Amino acid sequence: MYVIASISKDQSFPDYPKTDDRKYYTGKYHSNGPRLHEFIHEMNREVLSKYDCMTVGEAPGSTPEVARLFTDPEREELNMIFTFEHMNIDRIPGSVNRKWALKPFDLRDLKRVMSEWQNKLYNKGWNALYFENHDQPRVISRWGNDTTYREECAKAYATVLHGMQGTPYVYQGEELGMTNVQFPLDEYEDIEVRNAYQDLVVKNKTISEDDFRKAVWNKSRDNARVPIQWDDSENAGFTTGKPWFRLSDRYQEINVKKALEKNDSVFYYYKDLICLRHEEELLTEGDYQLLLPEDEKIFTYLRTSDKEQWIVVANLSEDTVSTEGLAKYVSDKEDIKIANYKDRTGIKADLRPYEAFMMRIR
């Protein structure tokens, strides 16, 4: 449900404070209005509840507390919502250049935000888990390595996401390890890019063209909107005509045909992750505990049920990293469930670049 959190407005229509740095303004008066949950509950009662359907709402500006109101089954509203909080960790807060004001990626911020949502919705709601969609760029280009360790990186981020409680969303091409594109600015179709260029670069001159280009290459929505890459033939096998948008320059390297021909491809790793989630109740029902919150390279957490405990570990860096901080979780019951380096047998060995695994430890 597109921007569903904006369907209720304060009927006194209060003004925002006047600003000189932008022509348009969105904020607290646009979302989570006074009758929002009344309307959603009514929609559920009168329409949604009459069908065997799953509902997810796009809810920018929502906190975990608001998400609980949306997704608590007893409230009969929605099944889950898309949060944007983790998508904003690499932007400078309050900048007039908005999403184009890049802030260096800090894994600790990602862990903090995602863990807060895991813990605050546990047994009270449900998470929609995602790194990519039609409004977000490719995660391995944005926060990882899309060259030397492209496949390892894609599998590592997939492992982190699929080990959490909630419903993982896999956006087209994510299961192939597709990457961002780097086109000249005048070739981008996204109206957000075109408007921001005129507003920030041309008119207000708050960001240089070079810095804006780098930001577009990093975060433009068009990164995820190129035609899907089916094979290495003309137009990537997408069409015999002329596609509406330029193809990624890497379609001959990254495509469905190649993924299906390679036994250890990103595609098959995603299939294994999805099968694991269907087979293992712990991944659905177990609680969540973040480990090593201040580690700048390792994303690791526990999933625990009454019957067993798993550890999920991902080195989200290009370095070899020690697992010394996880020594207390070494167990004689270690059982690897999935790993993107096939020779991983336990916790003790150092983590190689973008190495990730899920392991039962009791």
Task: Tell where the protein language model's regions lie, with residue ranges.
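Active-site and adjacent substrate-binding regions of carbohydrate-active enzymes
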Residues: 1-362
